[in-house]
Amino acid sequence: MKRIRHSVVFLVGLMGLVQGFFGGGGLMAKGFSADSIAPKMQWFADAKLGIFIHWGIYAVEGTSESWSFHSRNTTYPYYMGQLKGFGAEKYDPKVWATLIKESGAQYAVITTQHHDGVALWNTQQLTPNTPWSLSAKDPLKMQKPALWNAKLPLSVVAQSPAKRDVIAPFASALREKGLKFGAYYSLLDWSHNDYPGLYNDQGRYKLAEDPMRWQRFLQFMHGQIGELSTQFHPDLFWFDGDWEHSNEEWNAPKIRRDILAANPNAIMNGRLQGYGDYATPEQNMPISRPTLIGLDGKAHGTLWELCMTSNDNWGWRPNDTLMKTSNEVIRIFSECLGMGGNLLLDIGPKADGTITWEQTRLLKDLGRWTSKHAEAIYGSLAGMPAGHFYGPSTISKDSTILYLFLTQVQGIGKDDKYINEEELEEAINEVLGKVGDDHIELDGSSGLTCSVMVKGLRNEILSAEVLGVEGKLRPKVVGKISWSSVPGTVFMEVPVDALDSDVTVLKLKLKGPLSLYRGAGGFH
């Protein structure tokens, strides 16, 4: 057999370390200091992975949640007519909780009420039956018949065939699995007749013209938040829909005050306009580490969470086939970890309460990877900044263990099946093409290796290994001048058959806390 050698080279530059991960765990707002918030944020900082669930009447026809009628892509009566089809016949919260646990997530957030104003719990707050046409000339303005029974709350309990609270059993199922429960709640409510907005081009009234009407809505909204607080004691409140009004108009201080009165350990996302605990970028992967902006307009706190769909929509859409692959999700998750953040990955169950097999498979694949690499994930701190390492990194809390995430190559090894060497070589060449490496050689007798290079590391490496694989790597230091303070360059040859099928993680145990050289080189 012809001897060919194959080497994949990764450049890993160690340049800097983000410190103080937990010191600013919450936003400094009026009456709340970062120091007083930080301890209760510990579980969130350590959790790293959560599952987001968008579920509501929009799953009946697979329409865009709330936005479809708000943007007039469908009529309001058609949208609200989905109430009659929401049955949740196959809903089993214990099955959901088991799958979430298997994914490696430490918490889950579910939509208790989206912008459409339909509650998924047994709320006792009444929603006036609103005219869906705002035109004075429209004969249907008075709306006959009504879209729901205004003598009963606008909820799936009172107005749909489901006839049950779907939030309470889910919260219980999560806690039975040792998971934290998060409640998504939309501040705005386009179905409430006392809320100013309805359509994107036309509202019911202007707040300044009818402040008493707005106060009636606030009483309704604060009443619902109070119900969620006292009935379910959420570990996390995930607010949304804040953009249509200011924090003064929402009375955000009261929201926070009331929640903490019911549960002092509850945390809130950053969509309370100055009264939340962590930043919440959406969909798009940040390049630099997000920070929470306080009431003073300055950055406060370092905790953040990326919320992201598993396909292109939050709720179930039958025509959305653009599922993210497990490899893509894991690589995105790795990037979040490298910047000290969390990933809140969304799924959208069907109206009957079942989760699609595509999303089930995604969560199971995620679970395989998280269980294998748990020590590099949970409780880790942000690693090196971007620009000098082609892949994220994390460190242990005592800074003596460095984890390198090799995201630039999709695994080729024990997790993938190839019939023969020709197929294996073809797969390798395909992967190398993706990373732009033109140095391609194969060695059928000596095996395949991936060469990882680390520079700027002052510490002695006590041991190096591939997480989840037996055996040790042999770091080699080159270019170290005995009389210079500039450290040498570290090379490690990683067997290709030790690579994970998604993202491989290397564990470097260091002598002492991580110490990095950040100079320009030369004779120092």
Which sequence ranges carry the predicted segments?
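Bacterial N-terminal signal peptides
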Residues: 9-20
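Short, surface-exposed linear motifs at loops/turns and structural transition points
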Residues: 23
